[in-house]
């Protein structure tokens, strides 16, 4: 292919940096969040008020990390920096001040790619979307069908406050979902007089009944109100006025216990039209009175008061790394505060220093817990660059402080009109997490308050103004404007052409003339996420299939020789660049040196900049990370240019699969039910060959009987098995290994008990001490093979950190080349997935008029019912592009260039292709897009013309090699004695309830009995059966399954007298099997069923 890419549509301009969310948030944490926490937390004074400890937050500093990123990965360490902060200890009595810099813990740092390295593994902190703090008004129907209203004040942290009305028009308040309290009691407890309240309300007459109700209950003064409040909130404790005062203060007016946060204050001021200063983060009397006033206006249905929609993105905000980490630091500092107070009280006041008071452990533990085990800290999906990028842009409603899968209703998961341009309506998982895990739209960004914004061009009097920067609007601001979609047709000056434009206004669609439009979106791609925007002709696909297409692109395995798609959308290069998989030069200059491991760029000032390439490293998902230079010595490069291709990249663009020749036709039933028929060319030409790197690890531990040893001298092993081991017993790099081969020889000392009786006898006779060790070597698991790529040895002497009890750790990396084979899963970009059912020799594949055999045959029935017609457009556009020898970029949603534009474009391209010399056969106007193929086996043409073309097809990570599994005899579960399940446990296949019904239906009694007893958990029976098979004897009758005995014992433990009885009423002793058996079987065998009948034949 030549590299001239034809641009069918202008590509999305103004694409932001796609990992911005992560980096900006962590930067905010280092510059503000951490300092904020340290400042809020000081001063700490002891219980007598004599000593005060101040943290001077803005003077904190980070030391250089101990290891760089690569070193941290290699050593299984955390890429982290030590935090030091200046502390000032003031003795109030003597006026003495001690200042000291104190170590307060280690903080993991973000790498340039927006990830963290924790214990050698790359992790990503997923963004969380939660309800924004603020005040929310809702309506509910009571059981008589009357509508009541309520208002909730939700803080960032602290107690909820909920006001509600009832049928008698009384106002109540609940604190943290406790019992209802008359609202006026709370007003009086806060020290407000009746007039204070009434003056603030626009309709005091509604409130009058609440005042009377309070008077009727005899609560006339502030003191009585405080007592009543205490009784309701702390029932069972003796009430007191001072107790009530303190309770009220600590619940709502103490900044340490109650915090609306910056966002909460902003939202409350906005909703209730208040002017409380931004730094007042607790509740004020004004907030409470305005909330009551607003609620009364709702109740009386007076204009200006509106209910809130909690699923609107104006009421949900994103918490990114920085804020999640800040919350965790707060938890750690609160634990630290208790320790400091205790140490102040216990220690000698005169000799105390800040370093003695501050113990870094609680803070370190809190941060470690967050990165190691929080639901939002995830092992990075590194299958390919797109998977990595999408993972960093993921937005989850789950996690601490969020929703749970079980409780999340339909409304939360649904697409909301305010998602437009902010969250992708397509990319979300299938299954229980659908709608709870979303992806950020391509142009969206998160503002300082955590609300998602999306950009627009202003429209002045029907003319789109593209001068300067676009305007970013959050969801609640956008609701007030009339916004036109990004694919509106304009003339060269930017005037909107159509007479009526569909716009979104207040979450509704309406049509307005151009001069009424306020804003227009930047680009049609702005609505969808990065993965979805890589699907060409997306607008012709059903949303369910587009969802599968988006999700499956993330599972594509990087191939040996990646190939850019013939038909792309123009975002491929941006995805590759922002994923961090390709090295980029930061300076203008000339390439002065290139080899496989490094690239050197000399800038205009003569300074050299080194770029080191990754070679054959293992990713988190066992795929291969490898970078190949694409610049030559002497090339002139500009800042931001790609220097090398990463995995699944070609020419600086993302290339997840291969462009292959596809025909849509049935072929001998081999593509029934989405199966795929492929040509042998895919195997021989390594089109879909990928490299996978497996890591095997073994540690030599200290045991009770002495240390384990890594050695070549393994008992009872032939010399040829040790051929590839060095003198230490470790495999050599480059050796080819198969399943069962030794990678690292290890022997473990064995105790007296481990010896068989004959050995003990020999010992007793000869008195000779044999070498008491047993073979415990690391071997290649079943079904695996490959070439040893690297061996790493870690010992305490070298200063490596090893797990407790280990003296030495050896790691062996084995690489395999996996060619495509029957059972592998493949997919296109439009959700058209299938399993390979047969690999045909290329001479048997159907072939084109010019003799080219096709690569893949797909079933045409996969298209109509699934409604993903985009694949057909891609097929034909790819066919035209390959014949024109170019590549095409098609931006989705192309109706702005005219109706039916995709159709016309594809047709024009095909006609253009057929005008090339000798290519007239490429396009047949009578049967557009189809060709008459011939059968490779007979040479006869098929009955009907067939749609043929080039499509981008991916090989997915669900490889048959990782899934195929067989078991003969293996481990059993301890309690039920049934075989374990799963490949990792060497397990069996479950014969479930429905399978039992199937066998019962056919009356296959003996087969069924065998499956439920000797092949599963009849311990005695299975040993006898094995014995009988080995000796060629008939298999004895099965006994009682172990799980049945367990069931009996469980019922007996409930106190039920339960037993098994024969027809004669004699109890059967289920435990008799345990006695050592006599040689004569106590049960009849199959012989007694009369084998003579069979022998006569």
From Swiss-Prot:
Residue ranges annotated as compositionally biased, kind Polar residues, are 1077-1091
Which keywords, in A-to-Z order, does the entry hold?
DNA-directed RNA polymerase, Nucleotidyltransferase, Transcription, Transferase
Q: Look at the named UniProt entry and state the broad enzyme category this protein falls under.
A: transferase
- Region Disordered, as annotated, extends over 1072-1097
Q: EC number(s) on record?
A: 2.7.7.6
Is-annotated flag, keyword GTP-binding?
no
Q: Which SUPFAM superfamilies match?
A: beta and beta-prime subunits of DNA dependent RNA-polymerase
* Annotated InterPro entries: DNA-dir_RNA_pol_bsu_ext_1_sf, DNA-dir_RNA_pol_bsu_external_1, DNA-dir_RNA_pol_su2, DNA-dir_RNAP_su2_dom, DNA-dir_RNAP_su2_hyb_sf, RNA_pol_bsu_bac, RNA_pol_bsu_CS, RNA_pol_bsu_protrusion
Matching HAMAP family: RNApol_bact_RpoB (MF_01321)
Under the subunit heading, UniProt states: In cyanobacteria the RNAP catalytic core is composed of 2 alpha, 1 beta, 1 beta', 1 gamma and 1 omega subunit. When a sigma factor is associated with the core the holoenzyme is formed, which can initiate transcription.
* Similarity comment: Belongs to the RNA polymerase beta chain family.
Q: What is this protein called?
A: DNA-directed RNA polymerase subunit beta
